[in-house]
Design a protein with these regions (language model features):
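Conserved phosphate-donor/acceptor-positioning beta-strand/loop module used by diverse small-molecule
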Residues: 94-115
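The conserved Walker
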Residues: 8
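Hydrophobic anchor at the beta1->P-loop junction of P-loop NTPases
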Residues: 4
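Conserved substrate/cofactor phosphate-moiety recognition/catalytic segment
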Residues: 14-66
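Small-molecule kinase domains that catalyze NTP-dependent phosphoryl transfer to phosphate-bearing small molecules
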Residues: 119-168
Length: 186
């Protein structure tokens, strides 16, 4: 399984779409699942309800990845995983290698992207998008820090200075069961 994580607005969704297209592997983005569920459940969402649906969605996306793993299939999961909850879920997964691509970006650029997305009029109404108004940078980076487990190899990428070809090749090697044995920065 490949998990693309990072703080909201860091460029995860853009990256997963590109990797899925270029590598021909399955992929699922947390926001797409959350929006699908919100459309089918209907109604408007308070901050608390949106957060609750987000927790369920993150869990569902990880469980989907685990099920694909059990079937011997590869999938790329994209989510702004809240680290402590995700690590607990992954403890129950088959102990197969996981490649984590942790996407980072300067805070000024993350906020610019985040607020542009919020103000674009194209953002689904289920997203309350007040994260950067409520928490400090330290709290956000701690909440969405990289996952740590014996079977997780982490590659850290800066979406403002991304060597996409190198990252794509790393993901391709992982998919072909080639060992990626140390933490890397690309």
């Amino acid at each position: 399984m490949i998990i693309i994580t990072g703080i909201p607005g860091s460029g995860k969704t853009t990256l997963v779409k590109r990797l899925v297209q270029d590598l021909g592997v399955r992929g699922v983005a947390q926001d797409a699942v959350k929006e699908f569920l919100a459309d089918h459940l209907g109604g408007t969402y308070t901050d608390q309800q949106s957060s609750a649906l987000g927790r369920v969605t993150r869990r569902a996306v990880l469980e989907l990845g685990i099920e694909f793993e059990k079937l011997g299939e590869q999938i790329i999961i994209e989510s702004a995983l809240q680290t402590s909850a995700a690590e607990e879920i992954l403890q129950h997964s088959p102990h197969r290698p996981i490649l984590q691509i942790y996407v980072t970006c300067g805070l000024a650029e993350v906020k610019r992207r985040f607020y542009a997305r919020k103000q674009s009029g194209h953002r689904h109404s289920v997203h309350t998008d007040d994260l950067y108004d409520k928490l400090t940078e330290h709290e956000i980076r701690d909440k969405y820090r990289p996952l740590v487990a014996d079977n997780i190899t982490t590659v850290i990428v800066d979406s403002e200075n991304l060597d996409y070809a190198a990252l794509r090749d790393t993901v391709k090697d992982f998919l072909m069961n080639k060992a990626i044995t140390e933490e890397n920065e690309i």
